[in-house]
């Protein structure tokens, strides 16, 4: 059953915070959490499994801050984040969906900043294409205070 069918049948529960749990497990101030997709995958897998075992139906991959402005190896970072979450699902033997988690790109859009709307759409489209290729079941766009940036992310998700 796909997620849209399941949403029509019942309430689905997301996991909880990831960053605070990574800090509890050693993430240093200023360290980018997404790097742990490659360097500390076992910790991410354990956290995802804890959420699944607690009843989460949707697990957010550790991709919230992953974009071309922060990572030269973006595809590797996102692919590993999705793979870690999928591995956690498989190891529990339970049904859960994996969300590509998209946060702000970290740049201000014009006129307040320097990023053009079309460029913002392109930044988010790249993330979406990588997440889709890696096997994400859905996209979660969160924690954006600029509605123009949110519009760029939604447009990228719809078109890709």
Show which residues each predicted segment covers.
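Domain-level signal for soluble alpha/beta catalytic cores
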Residues: 1-160
